[in-house]
Amino acid sequence: MGKPRGLRTARKLKNHRREQRWHDKDYKKSHLGTRWKSNPFGGASHAKGIVLEKVGVEAKQPNSAIRKCVRVQLIKNGKKITAFVPRDGCLNFIEENDEVLVAGFGRKGHAVGDIPGVRFKVVKVASVSLLALYKQKKERPRS
């Protein structure tokens, strides 16, 4: 049986469409309000935090590597997250108790590639872009 057609079926079609929308993953995600509760950023695109420690995360099979990450405590709500430090040698620019700016890491809130459970990446360290430090365009501010 198909959908009802004809006169006086608008209410039924409208109600059916409203019920079926909840089976759409993107609609459900945007309308349930869970992004405010479960997302450490609270719906924001970036967040500042304090580096607690440097950690190495082992890559998933079949790759073999230790991906350089940092544990960060967010300033806005105190939640602790693990953030990936991109590029070769950039972990050397980050020290404990530094203030870092953290952003999402692609894939709409899921882990990326072979790094298990890491959903964020470091963008800035001590208000200086990590890319600028890497390309030696800027230096870390003296503290």
UniProtKB/Swiss-Prot annotation:
GO BP: any one term: cytoplasmic translation
Where does the protein end up?
Cytoplasm, Cytosol; Cytoplasm; Rough endoplasmic reticulum
> According to the UniProt entry, which residue ranges have a biased composition of type Basic residues?
1-20
Q: Which domain of life is it from?
A: Eukaryota
> Which UniProt keywords are listed?
Cytoplasm, Endoplasmic reticulum, Hydroxylation, Ribonucleoprotein, Ribosomal protein
SUPFAM superfamilies the record matches: Nucleic acid-binding proteins (SSF50249)
Hydroxyproline occurs at 62
Q: Does the keyword Lipid metabolism apply?
A: no
Instruction: Quote the cellular component terms of the Gene Ontology held in the record.
Output: cytosolic small ribosomal subunit; rough endoplasmic reticulum
Molecular function via GO: structural constituent of ribosome
Q: Where is this region: Disordered?
A: 1-28
Q: Kindly report the protein's main subcellular placement as a broad class.
A: cytoplasm
The protein's assembly and partners: Component of the 40S small ribosomal subunit.
The family this protein is said to belong to: Belongs to the universal ribosomal protein uS12 family.
Tell me which PANTHER family the record gives. Answer: 30S RIBOSOMAL PROTEIN S12 FAMILY MEMBER
Q: What is this protein called?
A: Small ribosomal subunit protein uS12
Task: Name the encoding gene, please.
Answer: RPS23
